[in-house]
């Protein structure tokens, strides 16, 4: 995904999630261990969200494109974020995936797409 398409997809996802009651905490958290596209709050949950845009859905949607290694990077970046901001054990967490069909911009929201045990 090009950087421009990625930003567009993230903005679509952010707007969609806000419309569905989530509040933005941080966008594009980067550390040496990995990156998190969106960090949001839903009720008491801190939700770590990976945004995927696929122009060709023949090979599966967004979740199918997330490898074990990518999940591990997201989990490590999440741990880094929680330690950095001293919030470990203060919030239940969840890993979601937003999959966007690059042709129609149809959004699919996969809650609890994976867990720290992958």
Curated annotation (Swiss-Prot):
Gene3D superfamilies: 3.40.1350.10. It comes from the Bacteria. InterPro entries: Restrct_endonuc-II-like (IPR011335), tRNA_endonuc-like_dom_sf (IPR011856), UPF0102_YraN-like (IPR003509). GO terms for molecular function: nucleic acid binding. Belongs to the UPF0102 family. HAMAP family: UPF0102. This is UPF0102 protein LPC_3309. The lineage of its organism: Bacteria, Pseudomonadati, Pseudomonadota, Gammaproteobacteria, Legionellales.
């Amino acid at each position: 995904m090009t950087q421009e398409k990625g930003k567009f997809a993230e903005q679509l996802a952010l707007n969609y999630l806000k419309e569905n009651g989530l509040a933005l905490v941080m966008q594009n958290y980067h550390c040496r261990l990995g990156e998190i596209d969106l960090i949001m709050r839903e009720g008491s949950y801190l939700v770590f969200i990976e945004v995927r845009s696929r122009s060709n859905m023949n090979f599966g949607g967004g979740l199918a494109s997330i490898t074990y290694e990518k999940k591990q990077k997201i989990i490590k970046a999440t741990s880094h974020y929680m330690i950095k901001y001293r919030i470990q054990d203060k919030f239940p967490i969840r890993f979601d995936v937003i999959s966007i069909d690059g042709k129609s911009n149809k959004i699919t929201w996969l809650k609890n797409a994976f867990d720290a045990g992958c």
